């Protein structure tokens, strides 16, 4: 598709910087949300990425009316040559994230052993298990409707309700 070179360069710069590109499948969208400051239409983004996909420079995924494009190694090299970038600059998807040390301090204890569990509910759990039924009790005799001698059946709601009880 014929498009201004500044739009193509803006698309390629964003793609190289992030390593991925997302676009809603809407050709009538006036501006791509991530390139709104440069007035790049969403159609230009979709067609530029379609071109890169046909050359094998990006992989495409589509889900829930959104396109997702991921740079391949060949695509990284192509964009480096196209944008005249040095090899030290890499997309964000290839950078290692620096993780700070964990916020929670680890418990001090023996290195080889796990720390003891908190006994918050263990006593309650054991008491419940012991008092639930004495050993040798008949569980089948305790199950069922109980000592009620008169049962009352009520009709359901909706179509099969039938007569009103009197």
Swiss-Prot record:
Comp. bias intervals (Basic and acidic residues): 98-129
A single MF term (Gene Ontology): RNA binding
A single cellular component GO annotation: nucleolus
Highest taxon listed in the record's lineage: Eukaryota
Tagged with keyword Cytoplasm: yes
Compositional bias per record (Gly residues), positions renumbered to this chain: 155-166
Annotated region described as Disordered, given as residue ranges: 95-166
Pfam families per UniProt: S10_plectin
Stored Gene3D superfamilies: Winged helix-like DNA-binding domain superfamily/Winged helix DNA-binding domain
Subcellular location, record wording: Cytoplasm; Nucleus, Nucleolus
Bias (Low complexity): 143-154
Entry-linked InterPro entries: Plectin_eS10_N, Ribosomal_eS10, WH-like_DNA-bd_sf
Protein family per UniProt: Belongs to the eukaryotic ribosomal protein eS10 family.
Subunit structure: Component of the small ribosomal subunit.
Purpose: Component of the 40S ribosomal subunit. The ribosome is a large ribonucleoprotein complex responsible for the synthesis of proteins in the cell.
Protein name: Small ribosomal subunit protein eS10
Species this chain originates from: Ictalurus punctatus
């Amino acid at each position: 598709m014929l498009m201004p070179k500044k739009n193509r360069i803006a698309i390629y710069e964003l793609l190289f910087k992030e390593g991925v590109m997302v676009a809603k499948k809407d050709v009538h969208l006036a501006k791509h949300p991530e390139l709104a400051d440069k007035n790049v239409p969403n159609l230009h983004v979709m067609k530029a990425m379609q071109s890169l996909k046909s050359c094998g420079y990006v992989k495409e995924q589509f889900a829930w009316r959104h396109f997702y494009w991921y740079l391949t190694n060949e695509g990284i090299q192509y964009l480096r040559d196209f944008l005249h970038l040095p090899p030290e600059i890499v997309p964000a998807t290839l950078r290692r994230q620096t993780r700070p040390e964990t916020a929670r301090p680890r418990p001090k204890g023996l290195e080889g052993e796990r720390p003891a569990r908190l006994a918050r509910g263990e006593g309650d759990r054991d008491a419940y298990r012991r008092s639930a039924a004495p050993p040798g009790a008949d569980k089948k005799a305790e199950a069922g409707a109980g000592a009620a001698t008169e049962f009352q059946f009520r009709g359901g709601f909706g179509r099969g309700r039938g007569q009103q009880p009197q």
